[in-house]
Every structure is written in structure tokens, then in C-alpha cells.
Regions:
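Structural alpha/beta core scaffold segments of enzyme domains
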Residues: 1-175
Length: 175
């Protein structure tokens, strides 16, 4: 279990008792793999004389990418510059830190500071990037005869996979 996040507003138990009708539903959203027209792409350049990195990335989380590069490569945050290119389609699929971002920078260092560009193929998009979480929603809603919603309670179960990563963030947004 990666996250248990109770969210409470007012007193749903009392409000359910005041409702004229109570309905319980269960919804299932299957696993999905974002498939934007634009694949993941990055260009990394390790400036060998200054020992600084510049990376151009289609990441949806450029500041997280910068932090991850600094931590992984044991570098000062100020020595890493992330330039966010146009993401194009992302649908949450470009939030992850991918090995290609790190690889482009390290390959650039090995190439004497020349920029290294990595573009994933469609097949690589499906085999090396994350899918979006499948979720089961259990929802109980209490309403008045006039349609006024009095209360709603729910539970969301998400399959974050073996390496949950942004799973808790996605689950919190689902609530």
C-alpha cells in the first residue's frame, strides 16, 4: 500500500441520513497507456570545461528532472539547466524521469561534450514508459428528491504497479 489518504468534508454519515435516496456505484477505469503523437525526446549536453549540464526535454516535470539529475549524478543543482521544449501531447505520460534523460547527458560527457539526442520510437514508448493507473471507484451518494446532493463518500483503489512513482499523486487527484 503506497498511500492511504482520508479526505473528509463536513459530516457525510449525518448527511446520508438526511438524504431521500442513497445510491451505491462501482466504476472501473482500465489501465491506459498515453500515446501522444510526439514521442519522448531529449537532448543532453555535458559541458566538459565547466562541468555543467544542459538538457532539452519534453518532460512535463522539468524541475523534478533537474532535481533527479542533480541527486543521481551527485552534482550541484545550479550546474544543471533544464530547458523545457514543447511537450506536445503528454496526458501525464511525460511526468516520469526516464533513463534516456540521464543517458543523453552521460553519453554527451563520453563524447567530449557533444550534444546527444535521444528520441523514442513508438515501440519504445510502449515498452519503456509508464502506463496510467487502472482504478476502481466505489461511490456512495445521498440525494434529496429535488436532486440536491447531500453527501458523497468513496474509495479509490489504484494499481500503481511495482514502482509506484507518481501513483500517490495520481490517487490524491482522483479523490
Amino acid at each position: 500500500i503506497a498511500l492511504i489518504l482520508p479526505v473528509n468534508f463536513n459530516n457525510p454519515e449525518r448527511m446520508m441520513k438526511e438524504a431521500d435516496h442513497v445510491r451505491e456505484d462501482k466504476f472501473w477505469c482500465p489501465v491506459a497507456h498515453p500515446s501522444p503523437m510526439e514521442p519522448h525526446v531529449c537532448v543532453g549536453q555535458w559541458e566538459t570545461f565547466t562541468d555543467k549540464i544542459t538538457i532539452w526535454s519534453s518532460s512535463q516535470a522539468p524541475f523534478k528532472l533537474r532535481e533527479a539529475l542533480a541527486k543521481t549524478l551527485k552534482m550541484d543543482l545550479n550546474n544543471i539547466r533544464v530547458i523545457k521544449m514543447a511537450t506536445g501531447g503528454g496526458f501525464g505520460g511525460k511526468l516520469e524521469m526516464l533513463p534516456m534523460d540521464f543517458s543523453a547527458c552521460l553519453l554527451s560527457k563520453k563524447a567530449g561534450g557533444l550534444p546527444v539526442k535521444i528520441v523514442l520510437t513508438r515501440e519504445e514508448e510502449f515498452t519503456t514508459t509508464r502506463r496510467k493507473h487502472g482504478m476502481i471507484y466505489k461511490v456512495k451518494t445521498g440525494v434529496k428528491k429535488d436532486g440536491t446532493i447531500m453527501a458523497m463518500t468513496g474509495e479509490v483503489l489504484a494499481d500503481g504497479g511495482a514502482y509506484c512513482s507518481y501513483g500517490p499523486t495520481v490517487l490524491a487527484a482522483a479523490m
